[in-house]
From Swiss-Prot:
Stated name of the protein: UDP-N-acetylglucosamine--N-acetylmuramyl-(pentapeptide) pyrophosphoryl-undecaprenol N-acetylglucosamine transferase
EC number: 2.4.1.227
GO molecular function: undecaprenyldiphospho-muramoylpentapeptide beta-N-acetylglucosaminyltransferase activity
Species this protein is from: Staphylococcus carnosus (strain TM300)
Record key words, sorted: Cell cycle, Cell division, Cell membrane, Cell shape, Cell wall biogenesis/degradation, Glycosyltransferase, Membrane, Peptidoglycan synthesis, Transferase
CDD domains documented for this protein: GT28_MurG
PANTHER family reported for this sequence: UDP-N-ACETYLGLUCOSAMINE--N-ACETYLMURAMYL-(PENTAPEPTIDE) PYROPHOSPHORYL-UNDECAPRENOL N-ACETYLGLUCOSAMINE TRANSFERASE, UDP-N-ACETYLGLUCOSAMINE--N-ACETYLMURAMYL-(PENTAPEPTIDE) PYROPHOSPHORYL-UNDECAPRENOL N-ACETYLGLUCOSAMINE TRANSFERASE 1
Subcellular location, principal: membrane
Family statement: Belongs to the glycosyltransferase 28 family. MurG subfamily.
GO cellular component, one term: plasma membrane
Gene name for this UniProt entry: murG
GO biological process, one term: cell division
Amino acid sequence: MTKIAFTGGGTVGHVSVNLSLIPIAQERGYEAFYVGSKNGIEREMIESQLPGIQYFPISSGKLRRYISVENIKDVFKVLKGVLDARKVLKKQKPDLLFSKGGFVSVPVVIAARSLNIPVVIHESDITPGLANKISLKFAKKIYTTFEDTLKYLPKEKADFVGATVRDDLKEGNRTNGFQLTGFNDDKKVLLVMGGSLGSKKINELIRQNLDTLLKEYQIIHLTGRGLLDETIQREGYKQFEFVTDELTDLLAITDTVVSRAGANAIYEFLTLNIPMLLIPLGLDQSRGDQIDNAKNFQNKGYAETLPEDQANTTNFIESLHKIESNRSDIEKQMHEYHQLFTKEDLLDKILKDTNQKETRES
């Protein structure tokens, strides 16, 4: 029986594909387990959403692109992580490792390669992240969400597979969504989210412009943990720090999204045909991957993009008005999008590329 190790973490985007694939593997009778950090968001997500999956925590260090004393400490954390992961993999004896990236994945990938366990990695953003650039040296294959990513990768290792979204995405219940928020059908619903960690900039934009926004929208505001402002109590405005199971119900009542531009999130909005205003993380906070993602979606007619350093009241409100003016054209473009690989197809490809015998075709 095929046994699959999964890894990836640090953000929701580095876990979501794994959350889609693991249940498919289980349905086929394969064994699966997860290797992640001790306190990362991946542990919380896996243990809460897939309680039957064994989770093995390892030491992990952050990968930084800038000079810092912390880099020296983290070298030792990564080395310990390799030893931790090697111990887990040696005992569990998986047939392959699937890595979704993020800093925690690097020691697991290195450990797998040292034990001759075939590795497949997945890159969601247009430009490969640092963790996947390192992991690529040890992997048999790297799969990409964006076709444009292929130009940054070796041809013999890279395959374009498109986005993989979770099963329950389209199962949201509008009645539940309205009950959760106290909203109704009388006015459009604007969903605001700043990524898994929240965004102070987006939160400020919304709160500063509530009077204007509430004239046109009912607002669901996902603020990020610890970023609620309980002093703001307005009709048509509902705050949550973070949601998991309830998100599909909230998306079911959403007409427009204001969001960061993480690849997994924006492909979920695309799958649901929800027009979006994307405010990507700036170069002062990231390597620019979200900027590239947002530009790609704007060029395809799926979204409007507002750079964070230009995100003032005037530009923000104008961008939302532009979406409403062009809503029919945006939705038309979105309806033409088709998923390239289903989750079942992707799992088959992983098994085939790592020379496993058990696939649907066999």
